[in-house]
């Protein structure tokens, strides 16, 4: 069946009423549900469009979109709301963070809903997106996204420096040399005005480079008992990452980053490359001053990427579970994922949408979205555990100290391991 026809059929199915009896019952005559997300203005607009389309098809279900701009504020709001027993009916949760709520019984398992759905089937989704959201054998949330870390680059700056577009098989050395070439004092005053690279400094950012070098984040990925950042392979990768700043100076230092974030520099045309997942695309599409595209991560000893996936999760205390499921089901149908994909926000978790023009349209930037699909076979995940966010945050604090020259790599690794250790015993 042609792809376009299949998408149309999926859309028609989304409009039709579901006849099965859902675990949460049937929606009442008029139901009101809340849906909480985070992100910048462009991301908010994407979800506003999704909600608007849903309302047209389900006028009996009123959806209130709650938008929290900052990720840190969003995490705090989630914690407060769930602790108070007043969470939104539906929340977006990253696979690294949902376990903290699942372990407390705060999420409604969605596997039984999916099993009874006539609109969605587990086999329609990428396994790589679904598996991380299985907690103790049960699917807890429905993933919308199968992104990975990539290199966004300013093509105009590449051309001005005489650089070709990054090749699919470029190496760490190629990456570093490119960043060096792009780092420039453009006005001759002795200060760097244009950096070659910008990145968040976190365990999540350095992880794929550790894997590429043959190392790992923890001792046993399925049943971790400690961070394994002190192995030779992991340490070497961390040193390489830290040297991008302390040795090669191709990224802003702490003072420069505080004055203007790397992402802002990229948006303003004064940064050659920026590491991010797909979620930055709606914002980057507002760029009018230069051409840009996306490239895969450079390769180390082996190829490896890191999963960036979030999912629609339902609060266990929701009083409108049937209505909430109806929205989640629509959002992850062919039609719903098509809506979000065209905004640039996601790498769709539905195979049919990921392979469609909604995602791969070469006329919509980035032109090389195929990069994200090509990386799927090499995607890896962090451990799925209740306390991983705490571990990641503490390790990130120490990595920042090393990255900005406030500690050696060995000091940062030792401190990260020691500070994180209590959280391994506290996780289910």
PLM regions: where:
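Conserved N-terminal structural module of periplasmic/extracytoplasmic solute-binding proteins
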Residues: 10, 14-106, 115-122, 137, ...
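Glycine-centered hinge/linker elements that transmit conformational signals in sensory
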Residues: 178-180, 223-255, 297
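Extracytoplasmic/periplasmic solute-binding protein
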Residues: 135-144, 149, 159, 174-226, ...
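Short helix-initiation/N-cap motifs at beta->coil->alpha
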Residues: 67-77, 96, 170-177, 252-267, ...
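Short, solvent-exposed loop/beta-turn-alpha elements that line the ligand-binding surface or hinge
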Residues: 111-125, 168, 187-196, 215-236, ...
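Long, aromatic- and glycine/proline-rich binding clefts that accommodate carbohydrate-like moieties
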Residues: 128, 292, 342-397, 401, ...
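Hinge/lid segment of periplasmic solute-binding proteins
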Residues: 93-150, 209, 293-295, 360-374
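Extracytoplasmic/periplasmic substrate-recognition and gating elements
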Residues: 56-57, 161, 225, 243-252, ...
């Amino acid at each position: 069946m042609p792809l376009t026809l299949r998408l149309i059929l999926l859309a028609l199915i989304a409009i039709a009423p579901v006849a099965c009896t859902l675990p949460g019952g049937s929606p009442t005559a008029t139901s009101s549900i809340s849906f909480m997300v985070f992100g910048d203005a462009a991301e908010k607009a994407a979800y506003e469009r999704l909600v608007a389309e849903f309302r047209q098809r389900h006028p009996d279900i009123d959806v209130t979109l709650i938008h929290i701009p900052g990720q840190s504020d969003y995490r705090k709001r989630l914690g407060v709301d769930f602790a108070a027993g007043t969470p939104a009916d539906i929340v977006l949760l990253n696979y690294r963070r949902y376990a903290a709520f699942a372990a407390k019984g705060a999420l409604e398992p969605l596997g039984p809903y999916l099993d009874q759905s006539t609109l969605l089937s587990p086999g329609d989704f990428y396994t790589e997106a679904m598996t991380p959201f299985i907690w103790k054998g049960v699917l807890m949330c429905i993933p919308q996204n199968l992104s990975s870390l990539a290199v966004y680059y300013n093509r105009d700056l590449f051309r001005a420096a005489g650089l070709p577009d990054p090749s699919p098989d470029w190496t760490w050395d190629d990456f570093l040399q490119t960043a060096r070439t792009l780092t420039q004092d453009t006005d001759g005053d002795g200060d760097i005005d244009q950096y070659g690279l910008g990145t968040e400094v976190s365990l999540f950012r350095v992880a794929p480079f550790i894997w590429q070098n043959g190392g790992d984040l923890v001792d046993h990925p399925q049943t971790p008992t400690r961070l394994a950042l002190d192995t030779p392979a992991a340490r070497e990768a961390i040193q390489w990452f830290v040297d991008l700043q302390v040795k090669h100076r191709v990224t802003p230092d702490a003072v420069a980053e505080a004055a203007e974030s790397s992402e802002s520099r990229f948006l303003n045309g004064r940064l050659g490359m920026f590491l991010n997942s797909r979620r930055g695309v709606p914002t980057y599409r507002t760029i009018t001053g230069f051409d840009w595209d996306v490239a895969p991560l450079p390769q180390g000893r082996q190829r490896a990427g890191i999963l960036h996936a979030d999912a629609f999760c339902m609060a266990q205390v929701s009083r409108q579970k049937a209505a909430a499921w109806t929205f989640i089901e629509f959002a992850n149908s062919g039609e719903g994922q098509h809506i979000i994909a065209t905004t640039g926000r996601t790498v769709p978790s539905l195979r049919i949408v990921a392979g469609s023009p909604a995602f791969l349209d070469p006329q919509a930037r980035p032109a090389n979205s195929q990069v994200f699909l090509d990386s799927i076979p090499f995607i890896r995940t962090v451990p799925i555990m209740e306390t991983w966010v705490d571990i990641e945050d503490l390790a990130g604090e120490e990595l920042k100290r090393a990255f900005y020259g406030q500690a050696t790599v060995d000091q940062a690794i030792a401190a990260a391991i020691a500070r994180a250790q209590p959280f391994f015993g506290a996780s289910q």
